[in-house]
Design a protein with these regions (language model features):
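Charged, amphipathic alpha-helical regulatory modules used
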Residues: 1-106
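Conserved catalytic cores of very large enzyme subunits
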Residues: 88, 96-384
C-alpha cells in the first residue's frame, strides 16, 4: 500500500509516522497517550490496506477527525498547528510579502525588532531584506517545529531568527585592551598601538564598528577606563616633553591633558552614535566602568570615568537641536568599597554617576562585592 505525497510521488505507507506526529502534538500539551496514538494510526492503516493508495491530505484529515472522536480536541488543534508549520516549510518562497511590506514600512515586527537599527534607511533595509530571506529558510529548514510553533503562538519569542543560518556569535566581551596594546588588523591593514589618547579613542571606535559588523548582538568594553588609561599617560608624557622649557609647565600639561581627555571621550561618544556598521546599525555597545585603587593607572582611570559620566550628563543634540539621552553606549558602573560609601576615595564618582542616572537613566549598577562572591573573585561587565 502506498501514500500519494503532495508532489505526486508514491511512497510506502508507514504507520509509525502517524504515531510520531500525533505523539508530538500530544507532547506539546503534556498529554502523552501512546494508546490513542497507536489506535488512530491502526485505524488509518486499515483504511490504507483497503484502498491500497491513500492521499496524504486524506490521512491528515483522518488524524484530525479521529482525535476529535477520541475526545482529544485540544490535541487535534495542536496537530493542526504542527501540520501548518510543516506545510509552511514545504513552500519554496514565503518571503516576498514580508520584504515588500518592509520596503513599504508596514512590516512592524521586523522594523521594531532592534532599537539600534533605523529600518527606514537604505543600508538597514537591505540588511533586513537579506534577513527576511534568512528567516524564511531558518523557519522552514533549520528551527525545530515545536519551537517555531511556540513562537508563532506567542508562547515564546525567538529573537534574531534572521541570523540563525550563519555561524555568527551573538554577544561578546572582546579583548579591546590587547588590540590597542599590541595592535590589530582592520580591513587587511595593520593598526599599530596608538601613541596618544585621542588616537586610541578613534581606533577603539573603529574596533567597535568592526566587531558589530561581525556579530549580531551586543559587545562590552570591559573596564573601559583601564583600556584607555595607558594612552592618556602617553599623551601626558608628550605634553611634558613639549612644554619642558616653559615656566608654567605643569599648568600647561594639565590643561592639554584635560582637553585631550574631553576631546577623546567626545570623539568616542559621537563615533559610536554616528558610525554605521555594514548592516546599517549603530554598535550595540556597553561601557563597563570599574577600577581598583593602587593600580598602575589609577589616576588616569578616575579621570576617564569622570569624563565619561560628565559627557553623558551633558547628552547629545538630536536632529531638531534639542538635547537627548543617547541610547548607546550603555553605561554600567560597579559599586565597590572604594566608591560606594560616603568618605571613600572615589565616592565623588558614585555621586556623579547617581546624578547621571537621575538625568539620563544611565548608568546601570552592579555590586562588585557580590560579583566577587559568585564569580570566583572576579569583577567584569555584562556580555553586551
Amino acid at each position: 500500500m502506498f501514500v500519494i505525497k503532495r508532489d505526486g510521488r508514491k511512497v510506502d505507507f508507514d504507520k509509525s509516522k502517524i504515531t510520531i506526529a500525533i505523539g508530538k502534538a500530544q507532547h506539546s500539551l503534556l498529554k502523552d497517550n501512546e494508546k490513542i496514538a497507536n489506535s488512530i494510526a491502526e485505524e488509518i492503516a486499515q483504511e490504507a490496506i483497503m484502498l491500497q493508495e491513500i492521499d496524504i491530505k486524506r490521512i491528515e484529515k483522518m488524524v484530525f477527525d479521529l482525535l476529535v472522536k477520541h475526545k482529544q480536541k485540544d490535541v487535534a488543534r495542536a496537530y493542526e498547528g504542527y501540520r501548518a508549520v510543516r506545510e509552511y516549510r514545504r513552500i519554496t518562497n514565503t518571503s516576498d510579502k514580508d520584504i515588500l511590506e518592509l520596503i513599504a514600512g508596514s512590516n512592524k515586527e521586523t522594523i521594531n525588532e532592534n532599537s539600534n537599527k533605523d529600518a527606514y534607511i537604505i543600508p538597514t533595509q537591505r540588511d533586513l531584506m537579506a534577513g527576511e530571506i534568512s528567516k524564511d529558510i531558518a523557519r522552514r529548514k533549520l528551527i525545530p517545529i515545536d519551537i517555531m510553533e511556540a513562537h508563532d503562538k506567542g508562547v515564546l519569542h525567538l529573537h534574531d531568527i534572521d541570523y540563525q543560518l550563519q555561524p555568527m556569535n551573538n554577544c561578546g566581551l572582546p579583548d579591546f585592551k590587547d588590540m590597542l596594546a599590541n595592535g590589530t588588523v582592520i580591513n587587511k591593514k595593520k593598526i599599530e598601538s596608538p601613541k596618544s589618547f585621542q588616537v586610541a579613542c578613534t581606533v577603539l571606535s573603529q574596533l567597535f564598528a568592526v566587531v558589530a559588523s561581525s556579530q549580531y548582538g551586543g559587545q562590552t568594553a570591559n573596564h573601559i577606563e583601564e583600556i584607555l588609561a595607558p594612552y592618556l599617560r602617553k599623551s601626558k608624557h608628550k605634553y611634558e616633553k613639549m612644554f619642558q622649557n616653559e615656566d608654567n609647565k605643569e599648568a600647561l600639561v594639565d590643561l592639554m591633558v584635560k582637553k585631550e581627555l574631553k576631546d577623546g571621550i567626545q570623539t568616542l561618544q559621537y563615533q559610536i552614535n554616528t558610525l554605521m556598521t555594514c548592516n546599517g546599525q549603530s554598535p550595540f555597545l556597553t561601557l563597563f566602568m570599574h577600577f581598583m585603587p593602587g593600580s598602575e593607572y589609577e589616576e588616569e582611570c578616575a579621570m576617564i570615568t569622570e569624563e565619561i559620566l560628565r559627557q553623558r550628563i551633558e547628552g547629545m543634540k538630536g536632529p531638531d537641536g534639542v538635547t537627548i539621552s543617547p541610547t548607546f553606549p550603555k553605561l554600567v558602573y560597579a559599586l565597590d568599597e572604594h566608591n560606594a560609601k560616603p568618605g571613600s576615595k572615589y565616592y565623588y564618582l558614585t555621586k556623579l554617576a547617581a546624578e547621571c542616572t537621575a538625568k539620563r537613566m544611565m548608568p546601570d549598577y552592579v555590586s562588585a562585592k557580590i560579583m566577587r562572591q559568585v564569580k570566583d573573585g572576579q569583577v567584569f561587565g555584562p556580555m553586551g
